[in-house]
Structures are given as C-alpha cells and as structure tokens.
Amino acid sequence: MERDFLGAIWRKEEAAGKPEEHSDYRGGGGGASAAMQWQFPATKVGAASSAFMSFRSSAAAAREEDPKEAAVFDRFSLSGFRPPPRPSPGDAFDGAAAMKQRQFGFNGRQQYAAAAQHGHREQGVDSYGVAAPHHFPSPSPSPRHPVPFGHANPMLRVHSLPNVAGGSPYRNQSFSVGNSVAGSTVGVYGGPRDLQNPKVTQMTIFYDGLVNVFDNIPVEKAQELMLLASRASIPSPPSAARKSDSPISAAAKLTVPEALPARQIVVQKPEASVPLVSGVSNPITIVSQAVTLPKSFSSSNDSAGPKSGGLPLAVTPLSQASPSQPIPVATTNASAIMPRAVPQARKASLARFLEKRKERVSSVAPYPSSKSPLESSDTIGSPSTPSKSSCTDITPSTNNCEDSLCLGQPRNISFSSQEPPSTKLQI
C-alpha cells in the first residue's frame, strides 16, 4: 500500500479531473478531511511572514474565499499560522468542544467580549506584541488571538520602565497589559525601595575626653569610620617597642664617652653593660655603709693614703658613682680589666703598709689601757698583745677589702693569700 506524501497523488488526479474518488481519503490520522499540503502565503502576509509556514487543507483554502467563514475561522488562528482541518464528528476531540474550550482564559471568564471592545492594547503594546493587526493585516476586524488574557490577572502583569533617554516609553513584548507599579505583584521584593534616602541616625564618638555627637550619619559612613579606627590601632604595639628600645641605646651612648676619660678604655659591647646596672647598685650601698661604720672608720682612713698613692683613680670614680648609675658601669668594667697588669706591686705595698701600721700601734700603746670606745675594741687583750692587736686591726681592713671585692677589685685576694706571713712578726 503506498502512502500519499504532501498530497502528490491527489494533485495529479485532481488535475486529471477525478477529485471525487479521493474525497473519503483519510490521510494518516483518520480524519475526514483531504490531504495536507504545504503553502507559503507570501502575497497576503508580506515579507515579514514569509518565514512562517502553515498547514492548510483544500477545505480551508475554499473556506477562505467566503468572508463569513473567514471571520469566524480567523478568530481562532495564530499570527501567520493556520489550524489543522476540522476533524470528523466521530472523533473524540470535535471542533465544537475545542471552540468552547478556547473561549475561556486563565481566570475562567470569557475574554472575547473584552477583546472586541478593548482590542488588548495599552500604550501601543499588544498582548502578544507580535500579532498586532498593523503588523499582519487581516480582512476581518476581529483580533487574531487564540487565548487572550484578562486585565485583572496579576500573574501576567509586567512592569514597564519609565521613559528612556530617547523619550519613547519602553515596550514589553510579552504579556504586558499595563504599567502600574502599585497594584502589581510581579518583580516586587519587600515593598518599594528608596535608595536615594538611606537610613540615617546619630553617631557618638568619645575621643580625648570629649563626647562628639553627629546627626544624619548613614550606616555606610559609620562602618567606614569604624574600619579606619580599627586599622589605626593596629600599628601601635610596634611603635611602642621601638620607643622602648631608644632609652637603652641612648644610655649606652652616654656611658661610652664618660668611661673614656676615666680609664681610656673603649667599650665595644655596650649591650653587655646594661644588665649590670641592677647588680652594681647594691655594692655601692655596701661601700657607703662600710664608710659610716665606726669600727672600720679608722682603718679606712689609714688605708686611704697608700691606696690613693698607688692607684689614684680607683677611689675617685667610687665617690662620683653615687649620683648616677652609668658611671659605675664603666668604672667596674675598667676596674675588672686593669688590675691584671699590677698584681705583684699590690702585694709588696700591702705588706709594707701592714708592717708600718703594726709598728705604730705597738709604739703608741704597748699595754692595754682605757681608751675611747672606737679603739678599745681593737686593743683588748693580755699584756703581750702586740700581735693580737695587729690581727684585730687587720680584720676591719679585710672586711673593707671584701666589700670592695664586690666592685670587681681582685687586689684583696692576693692580700688574703699572703695574710699569715705578713701578720705574724716576731719581736
């Protein structure tokens, strides 16, 4: 069985004059209409609709010639498209049911009466935007909309923007029936937004003991100020650390020139001399206490002459050490370095000093007698007390030397090692 594609066989037989044999031909779908055929309506529609192809049967072409049927048929046609031929009465989807179903829009009301009155146009914009009558002319005055939409349907309203720079209103091409903004629910989020008037409030700033209140400050400006304040507070710890380092370096710079005239010693590492300040302060107080004690007063005065003669610069820095701390730092470093050069000269000088002192004590008071309380403690003993008195006189000097040992003067170490031969003298 051969099939008829595009009505080729029917056209041949119609040209031969036999159209009645194929009147009951059912083309594929089982309908009672004739075969479908391709047509390109380029004459009526124009150049713009030449791209659209429509299926029309011979019955539809014959019906187009009648203006009454064309008015009814054109009412249910799309722009540029033609519906399929009407099915037979025995079909499940008959034409009457289809026409009755198409008379209702989305909201359940008949729309053709309103469409005939209003024409579905507002501000020159058609409901479909493409099928306007001025685009596709039709012989009938009825609109060419198969499913028109009502004005009261809120789901199909689209906002129309205000006038553009050119002055012409913006046109929406699909489902635009109005440009109302207040009654529409499409495209609105959270109510109307006022971007020109943002939220403003008061801002209070506490700075330098003052309270500053500013009115009408937006939230964005307040956030920017807070961000700037947080950034400005970050680099403060490094700057404080740099400031704390500066006094140490300044003190180190001050100690070096003060130490040069005293000992003529260049301190190469001033950092090592800084921690010694706390350790040197205690020996200074010990020396001052030792000088004020009545027991060691005479011995310190006696020992001041030979010591100052041997090393004249050893006592003067100590007398000047009490007002300021950087000076004893330099003197202790100098005194710790210099005594290494003259250990033997100290030993001989100390031995001679002790011998002369013992001779003076024995010549002045060979026997015990009532003396002042300062000297009675040194001379208490039996009649043979020259050696004992000499030993007791040595002890304050040794205590004074031990006190001076804390200042970094190791000259008393040699004296303690040579104490037995120097003190025991046979008469």
Swiss-Prot record:
Post-translational modification comment from the UniProt entry: Ubiquitinated. Targeted for degradation by the SCF(COI1) E3 ubiquitin ligase-proteasome pathway during jasmonate signaling.
Instruction: Using the record's annotation, list all stretches that form the Tify domain.
Output: 196-231
Residue ranges under compositional bias (Polar residues)? 317-327, 369-402, 411-427
Q: What does this protein do?
A: Repressor of jasmonate responses.
Which key words are in the record?
Answer: Jasmonic acid signaling pathway, Nucleus, Transcription, Transcription regulation, Ubl conjugation
Summarize the record's induction comment.
Answer: By methyl jasmonate (MeJA). Induced by abscisic acid (ABA), and drought and salt stresses.
One Pfam annotation, family name?
Answer: Jas_motif
Record's GO cellular component terms: nucleus
Where does this polypeptide localize?
Nucleus
Q: How does it assemble?
A: Interacts with COI1A. Interacts with COI1A and COI1B in a coronatine-dependent manner. Coronatine is an analog of jasmonoyl isoleucine (JA-Ile).
Q: Any domain commentary?
A: The jas domain (343-367) is required for interaction with COI1.
- InterPro entries assigned: CCT_CS, TIFY/JAZ, Tify_dom
Compositional bias segments (type: Basic and acidic residues): 1-25
The record's region (Disordered) falls at 1-32, 128-154, 296-327, 361-427
Originating organism? Oryza sativa subsp. japonica
This protein is called: Protein TIFY 6a
One annotated GO biological process: regulation of jasmonic acid mediated signaling pathway
